Amino acid sequence: MKTIIALSYIFCLALGQDLPGNDNNTATLCLGHHAVPNGTLVKTITDDQIEVTNATELVQSSSTGKICNNPHRILDGIDCTLIDALLGDPHCDVFQNETWDLFVERSKAFSNCYPYDVPDYASLRSLVASSGTLEFITEGFTWTGVTQNGGSNACKRGPDSGFFSRLNWLTKSGSTYPVLNVTMPNNDNFDKLYIWGVHHPSTNQEQTSLYVQASGRVTVSTRRSQQTIIPNIGSRPWVRGQSSRISIYWTIVKPGDVLVINSNGNLIAPRGYFKMRTGKSSIMRSDAPIDTCISECITPNGSIPNDKPFQNVNKITYGACPKYVKQNTLKLATGMRNVPEKQTRGLFGAIAGFIENGWEGMIDGWYGFRHQNSEGTGQAADLKSTQAAIDQINGKLNRVIEKTNEKFHQIEKEFSEVEGRIQDLEKYVEDTKIDLWSYNAELLVALENQHTIDLTDSEMNKLFEKTRRQLRENAEDMGNGCFKIYHKCDNACIESIRNGTYDHDVYRDEALNNRFQIKGVELKSGYKDWILWISFAISCFLLCVVLLGFIMWACQRGNIRCNICI
């Protein structure tokens, strides 16, 4: 082979051909894309980890640590629960007739009145919370033959004995407690919420001393419902000096309906009604401080931005919030596949295109050109292909947010001990929903990432094919994203290729002439095949001569005998 190369060299000299090298009659043009030294790993449908030049985090994993009071109206419960504020606990009087979008209950909240229980506490709490108001209207109930406004030392209002301000404790008058039968129609066009109760004395003596009868009864009815409660007399654990209890009940009276109260003792009567409203108000348990700031989304941990489609802060939210998922991170590719530049090359130590690696330092575009010609080297971005890719990628984040952000709140689910199985079922359903959303989120992001990478690769290929169609036979595809241009191509010529105004006919003759020049040791010209065929033919000829000479020599020595038969 060395002999062949040497002969080729002599042959080229004899014909007066120019050897390839750093002449001024050719140029190199490479196409490439942006790259960064350290990219970001994302997940796609086909790859668990693929490096891209840029990515955006989609999961909000931290809160501000404070609850913003704008645009939602936040009502701080301070040391009162919503039910205590509803009943009119003396230390919660400041909440009378208040309104809210979100009522925040604190862990330090406590009751400071007569000990009570609410058999359907969660439902009442949720009902009042969603109404968003404690607006109370006093009504003129007529209670004949009984003593009103009972009080207790367990419920101090100032230095005096008191009671819940929204309830009326009825006891005997003298030595009688007549049967009470009171009606109250709803002539308005809204629902009315009535709160009432039943007193459970701790002893029979307390029962008769308050209500005369040994056993009382309370029945509250509307056309749609009826509740009858018989007091349970018996001692209970002491709370604020009392072993008796009050059970709190509630009744909703629709427009046109009638409230009927019938009792012969133990009645804790309503003083009026709460005006019910429909809305998206809610309640949340949180110890985060309330601050003057703006946030659409609130969690018990504090407010969070809603500029991301997912969050991992808390399942409980209020407002327009990202969807809760289990993942701590989900990254959306907002750049192309990253192939860091090989630093040993230098800028043009060995010029290479996008097939080998990306180009670092392209700050003015995602795709571009590098060239090497008689005037030196240079680089320029292709803004058209860059903008085409950016336009399609920019809307991705907004589309994902639109698909996932909830325009409603996820309230706390509470159940009584009796409803334990329902609570377990609810928890299972919620956990299943979270699992499904977490899976869907991961799949959605992987699909979008796959599309982004395919899209950016496609734009690179489009630019390469566009350049190839312009150059035609005037250049040769070097296989690494570069073209060897076989004519003198100055900077103006390079610019015409970049902007699509290159006229290949102008340079055709020069390119064809240079293209067929022998390229010396590179053996890349059209003579390479001829030289190889000639070398092969000469080798075969010499082999035949040697073989024929050996046969003739052997015949002369008598080692080989040939018989020819006719």
Swiss-Prot record:
Q: Tell me, which GO biological process terms does this entry list? A: clathrin-dependent endocytosis of virus by host cell; fusion of virus membrane with host endosome membrane; fusion of virus membrane with host plasma membrane; viral budding from plasma membrane; virion attachment to host cell
Indicate where this protein resides in the cell: Virion membrane; Host apical cell membrane
Carbohydrate-modified residues are: 24, 38, 54, 97, 181, 301, 499
Q: Where are the transmembrane segments?
A: 531-551
In chain numbering, the residues marked as site (Cleavage) are 345-346
Query: Topology with regard to the membrane?
Result: Single-pass type I membrane protein
Superkingdom of the source species: Viruses
Tell me a GO cellular component: host cell plasma membrane
Maturation and modification: Palmitoylated.
* Disulfide cross-links: 30-482, 68-293, 80-92, 113-155, 297-321, 489-493
**Family from the record:** Belongs to the influenza viruses hemagglutinin family.
Q: What is this protein called?
A: Hemagglutinin
> From what organism does this protein derive?
Influenza A virus (strain A/Northern Territory/60/1968 H3N2) (Influenza A virus (strain NT60))
Top-level taxonomy: Viruses, Riboviria, Orthornavirae, Negarnaviricota, Polyploviricotina
